[in-house]
Amino acid sequence: MTSQDSVDWQDVLPVDERQRIRDLISDATSADGVAPVGDQVLRELGQQRTRHLVALQDGALRGYLNLAPAGDGAPPMAELVVHPDARRRGIGSAMIRTALSVGGPDTRIWAHGDLEPARATAAALGLSAVRELLQMRRSLADLPTAPPVDGVRFATYAGPQDDAEVLRVNNAAFSWHPEQGGWTEADIAERRDEQWFDPDGFFLAFDEDSGRLLGFHWTKVHSATLGEVYVVGVDTAAQGRGLGGALTLIGLHHLADRLLSSGHDADVMLYVEADNTAAVKTYRRLGFEVVNTDVAYAVEG
């Protein structure tokens, strides 16, 4: 970078700057074939829960980094994007160094797709991979039949009255997870307000006798040709009954009914921790294959 460039923190992003950042993310996605940041970063653009680092060259936006603070045992996490026309100029390295100086050495720097430029930057900065998140996909055609589960009643999300049970199951099932664990009603409400939210694609499994929630599968539609297994959570007390597989297939059939009805092909994707070998094995049995890997880098040692 040169003396004409700047990398500065902003507490609040003006509306027009948020749009420029979205355009930057879109340009990088088109160039790389993979989005440089996750959906949560897009939700944070209008919030003050995270810190916003903006890189300018000659007054033009060329880079953006979002730094989420540590919380509930999770380290600080950063996601960044550099415009395709402004790479190999040290912008990414400068933003990462700035983020590490604020977040500390435990900060995780995410590289979505783990592309070669990201690996090279990480190596140059002395960062090593500490976490891998797999993206898996399969066609929505020719799905296996969802197996029955004795003593379970399946339903779809009825509204905020279901939130307390969803939170109980989610936070028990994902107590170990840096992003999915520790959810509050605000986390569900925020996603309920998203354009993609569809209560008919949010499946709940209740114990027929007690009425307690045993598990859930929240699906998401990205486009006319792509759906997602957004979250599958099973109460720790209900695991081992095949409920996760049944819920997954119920959601997959819902996505197939919705996306294949127009006669074109459609796929479904999901994200899973690379070291969650049981889940990866289950998804492989259901026909999913790894298509991409997101990697979190951190300071060595």
UniProtKB/Swiss-Prot annotation:
Residues reported to bind acetyl-CoA 2: V232, G233, V234, N276, T277, A278, A279, V280, K281
Keywords: Acyltransferase, Repeat, Transferase
MF terms (GO), sorted A to Z: mycothiol synthase activity; protein-N-terminal-alanine acetyltransferase activity
Presence of keyword Transcription: no
Residue ranges of every copy of the N-acetyltransferase domain listed in the record: 7-150, 152-301
GO BP field: mycothiol biosynthetic process
Residues annotated as binding acetyl-CoA 1: L80, V81, V82, R88, R89, G90, I91, G92, S93
Sequence positions that bind 1D-myo-inositol 2-(L-cysteinylamino)-2-deoxy-alpha-D-glucopyranoside: D39, E179, K220, E228, Y271
Domain of life of the organism encoding this protein: Bacteria
Pfam families: Acetyltransf_1 (PF00583)
E.C. numbers: 2.3.1.189
Top-tier EC class: transferase
Substrates-to-products reaction catalysed: 1D-myo-inositol 2-(L-cysteinylamino)-2-deoxy-alpha-D-glucopyranoside + acetyl-CoA = mycothiol + CoA + H(+)
Described purpose of this protein according to its UniProt entry: Catalyzes the transfer of acetyl from acetyl-CoA to desacetylmycothiol (Cys-GlcN-Ins) to form mycothiol.
Subunit structure: Monomer.
Record family assignment: Belongs to the acetyltransferase family. MshD subfamily.
Cited PANTHER family: L-AMINO ACID N-ACETYLTRANSFERASE, MYCOTHIOL ACETYLTRANSFERASE
Protein name: Mycothiol acetyltransferase
Species this protein is from: Mycolicibacterium vanbaalenii (strain DSM 7251 / JCM 13017 / BCRC 16820 / KCTC 9966 / NRRL B-24157 / PYR-1)
Lineage per the UniProt record: Bacteria, Bacillati, Actinomycetota, Actinomycetes, Mycobacteriales
Gene designation per UniProt: mshD
